[in-house]
UniProtKB/Swiss-Prot annotation:
GO terms for cellular component: chloroplast. The keyword tRNA processing applies. This is Maturase K. It comes from the Eukaryota. GO terms for biological process: mRNA processing; RNA splicing; tRNA processing. Signal peptide: none annotated. The keyword Plastid applies. Belongs to the intron maturase 2 family. MatK subfamily. GO terms for molecular function: RNA binding. Keywords: Chloroplast, mRNA processing, Plastid, RNA-binding, tRNA processing. InterPro entries: Domain_X (IPR024937), Maturase_MatK (IPR002866), Maturase_MatK_N (IPR024942). It comes from Cestrum elegans (Red cestrum). It is found in: Plastid, Chloroplast. Usually encoded in the trnK tRNA gene intron. Probably assists in splicing its own and other chloroplast group II introns.
Amino acid sequence: MEEIQRYLQPDRSQQHNFLYPLIFQEYIYALAHDHGLNINRSILLENPGYNNQLSLLIVKRLITRMYPQNHFFICTNDSNQNPFLGCNKSLYSQMISEGFAFILEIPFSLQLISSSSLSLEGKNVFKSHNLRSIHSTFPFLEDNFSHLNYVLDILIPYPVHLEILXQTLRYWVKDASSLHLLRFFLHEYWNLNSLITPKKPGYSFSKKKKRFFFFLYNSYVYECESTFVFLRNQSYHLRSTSFGALLERIYFYGKIECLVEVFAKDFQXTLWLFKDPXMHYVRYQGKSILASKGTFLLMNKWKFYLVNFWQCHFSXCFETGRIHINQLSNHSRDFLGYLSSVRLNPSMVRSQILENSFLINNAIKKFDTLVPIIPLIGSLAKANFCTVLGHPISKPVWSDLSDSDIIDRFGRICRKLFHYYSGSSKKKTLYRIKYILRLSCGRTLARKHKSTVRAFLKRSGSELLEEFLTSEEQVLSLTFRRASSSLWGVYRNRIWYLDIFSINDLANYQ
């Protein structure tokens, strides 16, 4: 039991008690800005008297103004005297949250450095940057999912109480002042800025405070997974112990002793033994997958176990409807922009023994990945490249650009789509997307020159849109040479590129 208690509190040896004074250091905010936190400078520039640099005096005053209860009274009294020091919640919440997130990451960064140094001493070099790609998950799924039967699709629950977010850090950060500021900050801006809203499953983050709340969310998920992985390992190790086929696993140690004694004396028969199959776990975008080769009964037990686990251990209201049991051969799922499924690939083998010949029907499971055409067209329609039905339209906001810039932007989007969906088993959908972007580019150029698409291409030449004709080949040339005609079949095969770290929203590409 003591071993379990030690494991339930992960290795938090890097506990620092002096994080709160770092909030008043100017270099913290400079480092936070340099690390790509994208502090909204437009908010700061709207305040007269501010010289685009964070000041220690400003930070102290902003923290002081977080504690009075009547913010409206402070605003009405101070805003006329000093416009900058008036009540601007978006200003100081933005400044402090970004700097505070950077400070809270220090214990985790130090632990990562210490763990990597220990692995180097043990001659077990671990390079985390090799595991950063989104596509690194798909080869794992190809190797394992074709041999599995059921999968649990889980929506990770969000904490219903703000205190849960603060408590996830209480073992890492022993600084009471920092935790107090964190609690006050969360409660103060929960309703004012809609930092985390349960409008849909998962989390909805404020764009201005994305890093801060992604950090809190990841620490919460880490706490969930650290406990869950330990309990799963305990269950996994139990499978080496032989036990009878009992529907109830409660007190099975005592039952197996009785069964073995009875069977050995009376029946002298060999017991049918079974083992818990290994569980494969994948987490992505607020969701997680538990896949196994076990039966529906086993997956149903894991479903109710997870519900009780989150409700009891994290006091989170978790509904059974957030976990779905699906059979891999009969269900496809939206996984990282792909429609993934395991389909049966039938094949027929002719066999002959002496004078007798017969046919054998064989079905091989194959992990299939398809391009979701409807969501892609929806993204293109949202970005004004086509209608909701997939009819290409011009992009008016790009009409003021030069012809080369317009073609370059359309070509860049097309190449990125071909690059990301190169792992698809069927690429016909990509050519439809390519057609939409190509015709949208032509209509944008025709709109700029006040002409029709046919007249513009006839006057400028069809080679003007050659960017789209070679988009796929240019992407694949990162690995294979385009000049080799013998590799034509390679372009039709799936290729997982390990340099893709994120999915860019086309609607935000302006």
